[in-house]
């Protein structure tokens, strides 16, 4: 591991324990960078920047050419609190559309409906005052038990405040099975 310079983590926010494990058991001076992007753009919105400090639980900043911010539901930019991760500029890896979506309506609905002209990626995030970002989970994963819309990130935020909880998963389950109009959150 002597020649190891960087480790990139992706898929979900890196747990504090995993961050500490890499530095304690792999290599203390490795550049450990969490990244966030998507298969739809074949790239990253946020990630590791070798010239910036690495902070446990944070992604260091926007990748080259990405004008990233966090918005409230009303479209105002916010710092230090959670909201919707957005990209405010066109970029080279944006898909130009969806296959079979001749009028572009599905494409616009997927990314640009929430904030016209601005890519909303579907991640619940906060832009820290340090400049880094924290990804809290998906914002577009919504449960709808009894007609009440609940974002899974809202539940994760509360559950993860408990020291006893290391990992959690939130799903909607039809309950009882013979009554599909009733959903319990597990």
Where are each of the predicted segments found?
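Gly/Ser/Thr-rich phosphate-binding loop
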Residues: 1-55, 67, 74
